[in-house]
Amino acid sequence: MGEEDWSDTQQQPRKRWTLEQLKGGNTFLSQQAGTNKFETQKGMTAVGMPRWNITKDKKQGYIAPDQRSENVLRVQCGTNQYASQKGETPIGASRFQVPKVTYKKEWETILDKEGEKIIPKQAGDYGLASQAGEVSMGGHRNQVALIRGRLPHDRRTHGVLCFQNGTNLFASQTGMSAPPGLGAVRQATQKIEGLELGEDILRRGTEFTPWYSGQNKFATQAGSGGFLKVRDVLPHTVGGKDIEEELKQKSEGIVPLQSGTNKLASQRGMTGFGTPRNTQLRAGWKKEWIEDYEAALKEWEETKPPGSASSVDPFGHYKKKFEERESSRQSEIDSQSVKASEPVEPEPEEEEEEEEEEKIEEPAAKEEEEEEEEEEEEEEEELEEEEEEEEEEEEDE
C-alpha cells in the first residue's frame, strides 16, 4: 500500500495519502512489539484464577461442563476428601488434648474429665508458679511480693521504686523550669542570693540558640523558598537591588545549565513513551520532505542577498579567496626571480678572507696571495669601467 503513490514516473501527478490509508496500519502491532493476530488470552478470567480449558473449544465451540466434579477439589489445589481441621477452634486456640476421633472404627471416643485439668509436659505446666492474675501484657510488674495469707493489703512500699527500675529517692529533674516534654532545654541558671534575675531577663535569653546546638544569628536559608527550589542569585547580590523587575524576570523561562537547558535540540514533538519506531524502508514522508528541502534550496539561491555564500557550495566563497591569495603569492615570487637575474656587483667572498688569515703564518704562500689581490683589483677596475660605459649609453639614449 502506497507504492503507487511514490513511483518515479513523472507522467502521472503525485497522489496524496488519504486519512484511511494513513490509519490503515493502526490496528496492527509491529513484530518488535508483538502481535495481536495469533493466540491470545482474550476473555480469560482475572489474574490467578484457574484457566477454563474444558468448556470452550475452537472447533466444537461451547462445551457443556460436567458438574459432577464441582464438589471435588483438584489435587493441585488441595483436597477435601481426607483428614482436615474442620470443626477445630480458631487460629491460636489451644488444641484439644483429649483425642476426638470419629473416623476410626476401633477407637472409642474418650471424654476423660479428669485429664482436662492437666496440660502435658510438651506444652508446659500450670501446676507450679504462673502469671495468673497479673496485669495485661506490657504492664508494670508489681514489685511488692503478693503473698497470700500474709499482709495482703500492705501498701507501705507502693510509693517507692525498686532499684532495678531506678529510684525516686535521690536527685531528680523534678521542678525544672523548662516546659515539659522530651528534649526540653535544661535551665542552667543558678539562683544566687542577692542577685535575683527577673522573669523578663530569663525569657530574653530564649531568643538565642546555645552554641552546642548551633546558632541563629548569622547567614541562614530563611526565605529561600521551598525544598529543591532553584536559588535566586541575582537580586540579592551586591548591586542586585538596583536591577529593574523586568530584567529580573527575563531569566525565569530559562533552565540553568547545571540542571540542563531548554534552548538546544530536544525531543519535543516526539511520539509517546514506548511507541514502536517506524521501520518502513520506503516512507513517503521522507521523499516528500526531501522534495520540500530541495525546493527551499532553489528558492534561497534565487532570492539570497548579495555577498552571501551559496547553500549548495557554502565554501565556494572561501575557495575564490584562497585562489586569489595563491596567485598574488606566485606573482611576488616571479618578480623576485626577475630581480635576482639582473647583474649585481660581486661581493668579496668570506671564505677567501678566512683562508688568507690561515695562510699568513706560511711564508711560502705570501707571493701567491699578493698575485691574487692584484688580479681582483684589476677585475674591479674592469667592472667599474663597464658600468660607466653603460651609464653614458643610457644618457645618450
Curated annotation (Swiss-Prot):
GO terms for molecular function: actin filament binding. GO terms for biological process: actin filament organization. The keyword NAD does not apply. InterPro entries: Calponin-like (IPR050606), Calponin_repeat (IPR000557). Keywords: Actin-binding, Repeat. One of its GO terms (cellular component) is actin cytoskeleton. Calponin-like repeats lie at residues 29-54, 73-98, 119-144, 161-189, 209-234, 255-280. Pfam families: Calponin. Residues 321-332 have a biased composition (Basic and acidic residues). Disruption phenotype: Recessive lethal. Severe defect in pharyngeal pumping. Residues 301-397 are annotated as: Disordered. Belongs to the calponin family. Required for pharyngeal pumping. This is Calponin-like protein clik-2. It comes from Caenorhabditis elegans. The gene is clik-2.
